[in-house]
Every structure is written in structure tokens, then in C-alpha cells.
Amino acid sequence: MAELYVKPGNKERGWNDPPQFSYGLQTQTGGTKRTPLTKRVAAPQDGSPRAPETSGPPPVDHPPPSSKASRPPPMGSCPASGVDPPSSPVIESETLIEDVLRPLEQALEDCRGHTKQVCDDISRRLALLHEQWDGGKLSVPVKKRMALLVQELLHHQWDTADDIHRSLMVDHVTEVSQWMVGVKRLIAEKRSLSSEENKEEKSTVAPENQTIPGFQPSS
């Protein structure tokens, strides 16, 4: 290939003159032409504009919307309206004054023949109880405990009735102090009367059970 780049020597020159190189052949046989760096790239044939290349940060993917936002509200959780639901009726029996005073007055009549003066004071105390009950000055707990006290009194449970009396004096002394003294005295008088009646019954039954010595009742 060297002979392609060397021109034949000039016949007029000497034998030792250097050969002349042919630069035209080098450009003809050289590699492929390089595209000049200043040449612009042709626009695409379809006519669509090219998106400008930006060097900003990549777009951030937003999370999908929460499914709670589109979920319908559960049944029964409707927004509260201005109308309040009707309140449930209170199932509670009212303690009647007759259920308390009538047994107390009956117990008072049973004791009146024994201690009249004491029973007169008890009667005045029971009148105060009646007045405060009708006047709405007694609370519901006091009324309920008095109903229990009367039931224990009717069943001759003296100790239990006395315990209820003491609890009322401790917990509600302001309400019951004016008339509870009479109730306490009535419990004591009723207990004493019951004890005397029991003794009389025992003394009456004893002679009937006695037998005459040496006498056998006929069968």
C-alpha cells in the first residue's frame, strides 16, 4: 500500500531526492466521514415537537388516595340531629308513705296500753315524719331504708331494724334527726312487748303439760 501514497519521482530530480507524497489519495481512502460537531440534528419527520430535556429532580409519585375517604359510614353512625332520642322510662317503684306509716302506727297502738307517756312522744315524732315526707323533704334513699326498717319490724327482726335505724342516723342525720328518735323508741317498746308476750305464753303452756303424780291419763 505504500506505493499508493508515493508519487513517482521527478525525472528531472536526482536519484536521491525524497519522494513526494500524495495527500489526495489519503483523503480518498481514509475512513468514513465524520459528522461535524456543529451540525444540528434534523427534526423528526412526523412533525411532533420534542420534549425539552430538563435536568430537574425526577417527579415524585404521590400515594394513592386512602380508601377510608370513599368508604360509606357504617350503619347506625348517622350524624346526630337536633332531636334527642326518647329517654327510657325509669323502672323504679315509688315508696308510698302509707306503706311506712301504717305499720308504725299499728305498732304504736300495740304498745299504747303499756307505756302511754312514751307512746305519746312517739306519736308526735311520727307526725313529723308524715309532714316531712309529704313536704318532699326526704330523699329517695331515706324512704327506701324506712320501708326496709318497717318490713324488719313486722317480722320481729329487732336487731336488723335497729341496724337500719343507726345507718340512717349516720348517713342522713340532717333529714331524720327530728323523728328518728321516735322510731328508735318504738322498736325498743315493740321488742319489750314481744318478749313479755312470749313469757306469758310459756307460763300458760307449762301448767297444761304438768301431770298429777301416779295418775295416768286414759288413752
Swiss-Prot record:
Compositionally biased spans, kind Polar residues? 23-32, 206-219
Q: Mind listing the GO biological process terms from this record?
A: apoptotic process; negative regulation of myoblast differentiation
Q: Which residues carry this modification: Phosphoserine?
A: S48
What Pfam families is this protein classified in? SRA1 (PF07304)
One Gene Ontology CC term in the entry: cytoplasm
Compartments in which it is found:
Nucleus; Cytoplasm
Which residues lie in Basic and acidic residues bias regions?
192-203
Which GO terms of the molecular function aspect are on file?
steroid receptor RNA activator RNA binding; transcription coactivator activity
Q: Does ATP-binding show up as a keyword for this record?
A: no
Q: Does the keyword RNA-binding apply?
A: no
Q: In which tissues is it expressed?
A: Expressed in various prostate cancer cell lines.
Region: Disordered, residue numbers: 1-90, 192-219
Query: Which residue windows does the record flag with biased composition (Pro residues)?
Result: 55-76
Q: Report the main location listed first in the record.
A: nucleus
Record note on quaternary structure: SRA1 RNA exists in a ribonucleoprotein complex containing NCOA1. The RNA also forms a complex with PUS1 and RARG in the nucleus. Interacts with AR.
- Summary of the function given for this chain in its UniProt record: Functional RNA which acts as a transcriptional coactivator that selectively enhances steroid receptor-mediated transactivation ligand-independently through a mechanism involving the modulating N-terminal domain (AF-1) of steroid receptors. Also mediates transcriptional coactivation of steroid receptors ligand-dependently through the steroid-binding domain (AF-2). Enhances cellular proliferation and differentiation and promotes apoptosis in vivo. May play a role in tumorigenesis.
Instruction: State the similarity comment.
Output: Belongs to the SRA1 family.
Q: What else is known?
A: Appears to be the first example of a new class of functional RNAs also able to encode a protein. Rat SRAP1 may act as a protein rather than an RNA transcript.
Name used for this protein in its record: Steroid receptor RNA activator 1
Q: What's the source species for this entry?
A: Rattus norvegicus
